[in-house]
């Protein structure tokens, strides 16, 4: 097991002819980069993606809201299986009750140090930057904040939960 940066040393190691395969847990862009360095190299990758929860009109809205909050904000949303996209179908989309349950639960999450037993959501692994910072602070055209995330600390590791609406297919 070797932890490799995306620099010249990483490129040299990944593209070396004696490397039989690469197993990667990381970003899709990193997997593509590794393949660009050596096209014949098998890259077995678990990459980031859009994990979705679909809620239909037949769903138990109480259970759906609880599952959405846990899946989206557990581990500060940093788990590879975190739900980053919620799809509400039919009446579920129009349900003010479901919307309020989700927003009330998200806005009531207590953010703080993991050593504080009252905390329900801890810090980001590192200060928000790049795509993550953009996701916490910027909206794409047509999107709105249903619940705008707020930076809580100076360093940028603690953020309140955020919920955006108006997501369209193809949005990042």
Regions found by a protein language model. Give the residues of each.
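ALDH superfamily catalytic-core signature
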Residues: 15-21, 27-169
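Short intrinsically disordered, low-complexity coil segments enriched in acidic
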Residues: 1-5, 153, 171-172
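A structured beta-alpha segment of the ubiquitous adenosine-cofactor-binding alpha/beta core
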Residues: 1-20
């Amino acid at each position: 097991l070797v932890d490799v940066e995306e620099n010249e040393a990483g490129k040299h190691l990944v593209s070396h002819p004696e490397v039989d395969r690469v197993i990667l847990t990381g970003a899709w862009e990193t997997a593509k980069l590794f393949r660009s360095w050596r096209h014949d190299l098998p890259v077995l990758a678990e990459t980031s993606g859009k994990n979705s929860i679909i809620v239909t009109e037949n769903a138990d809205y109480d259970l759906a809201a609880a599952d959405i909050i846990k899946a989206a904000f557990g581990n500060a949303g940093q788990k590879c299986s975190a739900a980053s996209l919620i799809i509400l179908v039919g009446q579920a989309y129009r349900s003010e009750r479901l919307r309020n349950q989700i927003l009330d639960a998200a806005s009531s999450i207590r953010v703080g140090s993991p050593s504080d037993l009252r905390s329900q959501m801890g810090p980001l692994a590192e200060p928000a930057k790049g795509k993550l910072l953009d996701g916490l602070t910027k909206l794409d055209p047509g999107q709105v904040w249903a619940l705008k995330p707020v930076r809580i600390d100076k360093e940028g590791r603690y953020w309140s939960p955020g919920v955006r609406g108006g997501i369209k297919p193809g949005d990042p």
